[in-house]
Amino acid sequence: MQIGFARSIDPIISQEVTITRVAITTEKDAENKNTEMGRKTIVPYGLYRAEGYISANLARKVTGFSEDDLELLWEAILNMFEVDHSAARGNMAVRELIVFKHSKELGDCPAYKLFDAVEVKKNEDVEYPRKYQDYTVTVHEEQIPDSVEVRRMN
């Protein structure tokens, strides 16, 4: 299994916010009544796309990776942020997983053609996207061979 780095669909603009800690956490803080200032960089909204690959040939020959393992992997990817919330990341979620399954172990079609068949486009009436619904995700199935199964999961 290989997953490439995710890239944002549209340019993102990071913002820096100032935070102040007023909670007293040590006895020394209580004596001095100190507060602490800090900064945090945030991205108000970003939709990212990542692409990944699984080699059925290597799975069979080397790792023993099975169909059951594959289903568990899909479940883990779809829920990976649900069990690891963090103030540092804000509200992150996997919105959709589009999976291509070939009929042949070495593939029916080059991966780039399958990835090119997935279009993520900002809706025309949206200038600054702030939610997933500001985008339309289209899989152009006419560009995908009949021997490749397309599965959309969310």
Write out the residue ranges for each language-model feature.
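Basic polyanion-binding and macromolecular-assembly surfaces
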Residues: 1-154
